[in-house]
């Protein structure tokens, strides 16, 4: 299926796992075993999730190996309850990566003011990171520099940076979903056909415009001396994700 469908990796989140665990009896035996062993709810949840993620990493390992580490990653996010706690985010990211113990694992960290310092520190530890919740060009630029700072810190320790990968989950589709809704609301109260036509013409295009601006900023960054120095040591470029449409219309 991976080959036939061209699947190059998988992401996950607590909502996906909640739906899978609550709606599938295959987890019941492991849950009952955890209860019998006196494990807490969190311990049972993590044992189920870590196993699923580890198995997924193994399934996609051939993709990871065949592409030289460009594809084949499985993402798992740190608990949303610590999104505003840099230190906890760092420690949980390291704990997750150590517990699952797969080189094609990516840890999802939100690109918030508290999350970006964690991104740099986790990258410096040699852990792959998927930076999420990026909606603006500014947030993308900040993420790129956080990634670079993490690579620089690791290189300064004399450790390799050629096997570290990072993805910027720049949520293009969600921008259009929200902006289009605002445009639709405004169109109801506009009588001028010229103005209406201009607004209609913008629908579905704001996110792409945002991405084009971000790409120009990306080119400036990779043409700079700091990135060139890292690239010479084998650093991988920061990639995009989440460009697919979400508007059901």
Residue ranges, per PLM feature:
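Conserved small/polar residues in nucleotide/adenosyl-binding loops
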Residues: 240-247
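Glycine-enriched alpha-helix->loop->beta-strand junction motifs that scaffold or abut catalytic
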Residues: 6-7, 121-129
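Active-site beta->alpha loop and helix N-cap motifs at the rims of alpha/beta catalytic domains
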Residues: 17, 26-107, 111-114
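An N-terminal structural lobe/cap that precedes and organizes the functional/catalytic core
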Residues: 1-10, 15-20
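Catalytic or ion-translocation cores adjacent to nucleophile or general acid/base/metal-coordination motifs
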Residues: 133-170
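Catalytic beta/alpha-barrel core
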Residues: 104-112, 128-137
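A conserved active-site cap/scaffold subdomain adjacent to cofactor or substrate pockets
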Residues: 164-172, 176-215, 219
């Amino acid at each position: 299926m991976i080959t036939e469908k061209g699947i190059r990796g998988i992401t996950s989140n607590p909502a996906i796992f909640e739906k899978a665990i609550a709606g599938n009896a295959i987890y019941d035996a492991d849950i009952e075993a955890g209860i019998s062993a006196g494990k807490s709810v969190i311990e049972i949840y993590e044992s189920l999730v870590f196993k699923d993620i580890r198995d997924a990493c193994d399934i996609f390992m051939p993709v990871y190996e065949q592409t030289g580490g460009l594809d084949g990653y499985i993402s798992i996010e740190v608990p949303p309850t610590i999104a505003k706690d840099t230190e906890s985010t760092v420690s949980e990211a390291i704990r997750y990566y150590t517990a699952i113990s797969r080189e094609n694992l990516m840890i999802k960290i939100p690109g918030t003011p508290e999350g970006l310092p964690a991104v740099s520190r986790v990258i410096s530890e040699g852990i792959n990171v998927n930076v999420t919740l990026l909606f603006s060009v500014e947030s993308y630029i900040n993420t790129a520099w956080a990634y670079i700072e993490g690579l620089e810190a690791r290189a300064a320790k004399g450790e390799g940076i050629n096997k570290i990968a990072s993805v910027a989950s720049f949520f293009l589709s969600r921008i259009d979903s929200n902006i289009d809704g605002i445009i639709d609301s405004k169109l109801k109260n506009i009588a001028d056909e010229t103005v209406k036509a201009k607004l209609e013409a913008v629908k579905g295009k704001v996110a792409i415009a945002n991405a084009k601006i971000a790409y120009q900023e990306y080119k400036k960054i990779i043409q700079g001396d700091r990135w060139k120095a890292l690239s010479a040591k084998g650093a991988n470029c920061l990639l995009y994700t989440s460009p697919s449409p979400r508007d059901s219309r």
